Amino acid sequence: MKLAVFSYKLCWPSVSSPTGYATDGGFPFQMHALSELFDTTTLVVPCSSTTTRVGGMSLTGRNLSLRPLTNPVGNGLWRKAALLFWLVRNTPVLISEIRHADIVHAPIPGDIGTIGMLLALLWRKPLFVRYCGNWFVQRTSAEHFWRWFMLRFAAGRNVMLATGGADEQPSPHNPNVRWIFSTSLLEQELTACSRRRERPASERARLIIVCRQEKGKGIEKVIESLPLVMKSFPNATLDIVGDGTELTSFKQLAITHKIASRVTFHGKVDHEKVLLLLQQSDLFCYPTASEGFPKAVLEALACGLPVVTTCVSVLPKLIGNGSGLLVEKVTPEALAQAVFDCLSDAERYRSMSTRALETASQYSLERWRDTIGDLLRAACGPLRSDA
């Protein structure tokens, strides 16, 4: 079978990549894993002409190729307004790939994923939708539409997966919508990263947060908590990893609180550097307001790091076994207290680290691939001719 993946994920040319393209984040890992389920896989994605980017990774996989689209211009309303002209230019490619596909995968949110999803429905193609946002919270009309669509069409040859996890199914109205976790860690990486931690020296507390530098992730609260943490741990530091529109304002916030020398902004780094920074840290702080299934939290757990986070989405399930602490109210004072509670008791810290490793071991990329493969085979039959 041929899989066609329609995604908004921006890719770019790479002379060192077997497919000729690279991208960043967890996308290349997950596409490589999905390609192992099919005879051929085509990624239908926007491509930039810029070849020099930080944190890029080659797109590779079993008989994996890329069909480039032009990159939609603008953001927000401007992007929506320009999308009609983008469609006119890219419709021949979109329709050609839909017609030749045996199964269509649409990761959403995202406008290109949505277009692929609707075209697959129009051409009566088996559809595999993976919702990567917060399934429980719909703030926009698009989010309400995606949820309605998945509940309406989850049955038969259509596989609908919501990224996250809970004891109950995503919806009581349609049991065919199922949970799926998200990861970019291979089993060998989980083994390589696995190291039970001991509490750091009494005055040290190396905190880290890895995420997009945007509002809603709680980065400003972590920065504001650091002066309070330093009262108990005078040598405390904070590593902030990731890029985004709020990066400059967060840097200014560190200056305002007179802790710029204690905060290191790494920007966007590659996967290996993220894991290295996590291995060098003592505690992962992630007071986010909304999530699907945060891969960075899983990576922290895989490195044996206890996690301080919020009661949002799947996070209570990941942390509730004792691999960290959940804060009810996100304030600098609450975060500083949670940091103290994690680091002040050597036995508790050691236990949290052990629990973190146990939790992470359940979420390998191989298990993610096999879970999806089982669901697709149950809906559509054999996926590979050599199966």
Predicted regions and their residues:
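Nucleotide-activated donor-binding/catalytic signature segment of Leloir-type glycosyltransferases, i.e.
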Residues: K251-V269
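Conserved acidic donor-binding segment of nucleotide-sugar-dependent glycosyltransferases
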Residues: N321, L325-P332, D341-E347
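A short, well-ordered alpha-helix in the C-terminal region of glycosyltransferases
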Residues: D341, R348-Q362, T371-D374
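Short hydrophobic beta-strand element within catalytic cores of glycosyltransferases
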Residues: P306-T309
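Aromatic "clamp/platform" in nucleotide-sugar-dependent glycosyltransferases that forms part
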Residues: A289
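Short alpha-helical donor nucleotide-sugar binding micro-motif in glycosyltransferases
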Residues: I98, K268-V269, L276-S281, I372
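A short, active-site helix/loop in glycosyltransferases that binds the activated sugar's phosphate group
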Residues: V54, Q138, M150-R195
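A conserved mid-protein helix/loop that constitutes part of the nucleotide-sugar donor-binding site
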Residues: A192, A205-L228, T245-K251, E333
